[in-house]
From Swiss-Prot:
It comes from Finegoldia magna (strain ATCC 29328 / DSM 20472 / WAL 2508) (Peptostreptococcus magnus). It is an enzyme of class 2 (transferase). Its main location: membrane. GO terms for molecular function: UDP-N-acetyl-D-glucosamine:N-acetylmuramoyl-L-alanyl-D-glutamyl-meso-2,6-diaminopimelyl-D-alanyl-D-alanine-diphosphoundecaprenol 4-beta-N-acetylglucosaminlytransferase activity; undecaprenyldiphospho-muramoylpentapeptide beta-N-acetylglucosaminyltransferase activity. This is UDP-N-acetylglucosamine--N-acetylmuramyl-(pentapeptide) pyrophosphoryl-undecaprenol N-acetylglucosamine transferase.
Amino acid sequence: MNIIVSGGGTGGHIYPAISLIEELKKRDKDNKILYVGTEKGLESSIVPKLGIDFKTIHVRGIPRKINANSFKALKELFQGLREANKILKEFKPDLVIGTGGYVSGPILYKATKTKAKVAFHEQNSFPGITNRILSRYVDKYFVTFKESIKYFKNQDKAVVTGNPIRNRFTDIEKNKKSALEQYDISENKKVVFIFGGSNGSEILNKATLNMIEKISNQDKFEIVLATGKLNYDEFIQQSGKEIKNLHVYPYIDDIDKAYAVSDLIVTSSGAITLAELSFLGKASILVPKAYTTENHQEHNARAFEKNGASKVILEKDLNSDTLFDQINEILSDDNLLNELSENSKKMSYPTACKDIVDELYRLVEQDEKA
């Protein structure tokens, strides 16, 4: 089967695509897969390194308000549509699937005019504009949150699957002992892992910095903080190197180990992170990043809060007092900690990848039988 996968711009769109590619290859090693992205997007540096065939088209996000960039964006969109058409004619896909980001718009839209079956996956509780438009044309679409379906057209084509994540997080508990040693943390203490995504979060760093005295003067928990590479030197300069109960790192590559030792996670609410937290059944305090597209991070966080899986603090309300008090409240009440953890697990879709690929195969097979 010839399959085109498209999605890009951020890791939140790219890694679900990679997860689906891995499952499609596992299902049939003869599946021929082409990833379509943009040259400027993060996908151009990630996807080719994985040995996946990669082609680019020209496209950029169209500004919501008309400005000097609007004409350039429209010009690139039409160029991208022509390039998408050329790729489709040459590759002749049986199936085209998008995972979001404006790059997937031209290739999926043009694919709906061919014999290929077309589908997309939406990671966020409030869907992006590209997928909202595409819902009018595709054969099927998959969502992480059932709350997002109301924003789409053709709601009978929606399937709730959760967010596909890679299999690096299976059985992380076996790493817990070595991870505790790595972070030099006592087995008798609870652990809070604070991070703001791959680039860190200045607002989380500042709140942590300002509660150093409180952290040092208690013996209930220890904190592992990933500041982000660009923020690390400044944090250490302001905090000093040795702080009781606080372990500071610029970036954590083996995040599975950090998850393994943690009882409570404090983080932003990107779709991939939430999929990981629910897969692992981790209690969390979510601090959605303000000013994200369509404010999607707050929508994601509220979905978890509504289901009793997390506590939410908005960035405008975050300071050392609100954060420390919330951490202390959760870790002082084992019933609350367990409840958050159990409800988080209930939001997990551990077979998301398999379920999506099953549906995709059914979609193609229905067409063949017809």
